Structures are given as C-alpha cells and as structure tokens.
Amino acid sequence: MNLLLNYELFLAKAITFLFIIFITPFIFNIIKRKRTDQKKFKIILLEEKYKNIKKDILLSKMNKLEKKKWIKEEKKKDKEFEKKNKNNIVTLKKKTLFVLDFKGGIHAHEVIGLREEISAILLAANKDDEVLLRLESSGGVIHGYGLAAAQLERLRQNKIRLIISIDKIAASGGYMMACVADYIISAPFAIIGSIGVVGQLPNFNKLLKKCNIDVELHTAGDYKRTLTMFGQNTELTRKKFCQELNLTHEIFKKFIKKMRPCLDIENISNGEHWFGTIAFKKNLVDEINTSDNILMSKMKEKYTLLNIQYIYKNKKLENFTSFIIENIKIIIIKIFSYKKIL
C-alpha cells in the first residue's frame, strides 16, 4: 500500500515537473507574442549576394599573389566609381525588380505575408519597376487562393508589371494566381493547369446506425448544410452540392479568361494538367525558362534586385508546434474536408 502511495506521489511530482518545463515556456511565448509585434520585413539585395558568390569563386582559383593583386585592383575600381558618382544619384535612377516568394499550402495561409509585401512594394515602387513572384503551389481552398489572386491584381491595377515564374508547380489555385501575371514563365517540367474544382468527404451514417448511435442535425434554410459526415445525405443535397461545385468552376473559368483572353478556356478547363513545354503550346505560359535565368538577365540589364520577405520572429518551440499542428490539420482536411478545393 505504501509502495502504491509513494508511486502516486512520484507520478504527481513528475507530471508537475514536466508541466513546468514544457508548458510554462509555451504559455509565456503566447503572452509575449500578444504583447509585442513579432512581424518584420527582411530585405535582401540579391545582386550583392551574387557578386559575393562570384568573388569567392574567383578568389578560390587564385594563388596568394594573384589574390592580393586582384583585391587591390577591385578596391581601386570601387574608389574610382565612388569618386565619379559622388554627386550623382545613380541608384534612384536604376529600375528595381522586387522578388517575392510564395510557396502555398492547402489553405493559402501564406497570403498573410504576400499582402504585406505587396503593400510595401506599392508604397515604394516607381512606374518602371517590376515584380517577380517565384510561385509554387498545387492549389487549395477557393477563398484562400481567391484572396491571393486578388492581392496580385493590386499590382496590375497600379500598372506595375508582374512576372510570375513557376519552377515546380502552379496547379489549380496556384494557376489562378499565375494567370494574374503580365508574363508567365515556366520550367520545362513544371506542372501547370488543373483548372477544376473538387469536393469530397466520407459519410459515417450507416456505421453509426449499426452501432445504434443517432445523430441530430437541424438546419434553418433548405441548403444550410448540403453534405454531412454523420447525417443522412439525400439526392437533393447531393445535387445541390454538385451545383455549387459547377458554379465555382464557372467563376474560376471566367476569372482565368478575364486575366488571359488568349486562352481557349473550354479546352483547358477540364481539370487536366500539363508539363511546362505542353502548357506553353496551349498559351497557359509565355516562356520556358527558370527564375534563376530571369534574375541573371535582369542583373545584366542593371536592375536593382530586392528580395522582400515578410517574416514572423517565431521561437523554435512555436515553429515546432506550428509544424505539428499544421500537418495534423492537413491530414484531417484531406480525409474529411468537404470544402471546395481548387
């Protein structure tokens, strides 16, 4: 008996200790995050990054005497350039290419950063500046990707040229974003298209009946709930659900046709996807290339290359918990979701 009591006391102490070690810091992080603004912009001057890479490679090929001579010559060139352009505002006259990255998940949560990045660009951009968005997304919920596409439209409305580069995939909702661009670039084997809508969910009604479990589902309005996981689905509700899918598909098609009038929309909106080279022949993209080549060519054209990133200053614990929670949510959504997925 004493042994059992001692064990229970030990167990209580162990649980208390684990709570203090793991849960308390997490609670403090949440409180701190509420009190302080954890968001900020990170701006990277890409041409400096490439120049430093070039410098490191060149120096690695030289012996000590060559390195010394090369560094001396470079310093001399820099001094001459500074002296020559001392009274000239050269940088303000140069065109700027703002580089953004969007790697979208099923809910397009990344639009939180995209909207801030676009707002920042609109505040600072000149009329000849351009935006390059490196896009990677296989699509997701319509309201998420609809908002992402609407954010990109802000650039078109302000007459700022938008280039979208697809190195891997821009399918479904991803292509909804891509079609907003003035110019679309795709890698040869990138996946493009999938202009369709899907909605699915399991129904456990028969299983629950076998277990003698009743489900109460009451709605005000005939179509407040169409398909349900636990209630009994009828032909009427199934028909309504399919109507909603078709309506969403029609809106999707109209949006793409508006953004890219050159497309034969009925031919390419059957849900099929293609590799970049085939998508080019179907006018889904304008050029076969990679984002890296675009950056190099713009650098040769003397553009200032600015990579704009809106980031959160999350702690490692927050990153880890967010990663676990997000992946669990994605698995559950893929199994049970009835939302309209682009």
UniProtKB/Swiss-Prot annotation:
CDD domains with a match to the protein in the record: S49_Sppa_N_C (cd07023)
UniProt-listed GO biological process terms: proteolysis
Chief location: membrane
EC code: 3.4.21.-
Enzyme class of the recorded protein, top EC level: hydrolase
Entry-linked SUPFAM superfamilies: ClpP/crotonase (SSF52096)
Any one of the GO CC terms: plasma membrane
Keywords: Cell membrane, Hydrolase, Membrane, Protease, Serine protease, Transmembrane, Transmembrane helix
Membrane topology reported for the UniProt record: Single-pass membrane protein
Active site (catalytic residues): S172 (nucleophile), K224 (proton donor/acceptor)
Record carries keyword Transmembrane helix: yes
Highest taxon of the lineage: Bacteria
A GO term for molecular function: serine-type endopeptidase activity
Residues of the signal peptide: none
InterPro entries, sorted: ClpP/crotonase-like_dom_sf, Peptidase_S49, Peptidase_S49_N_proteobac, S49_SppA_C
Family in the record: Belongs to the peptidase S49 family.
Protein task: Possible protease.
NCBIfam families registered for this protein in UniProt: PRK11778.1
Name this protein carries in UniProt: Probable protease SohB
Source organism of the structure: Buchnera aphidicola subsp. Schizaphis graminum (strain Sg)
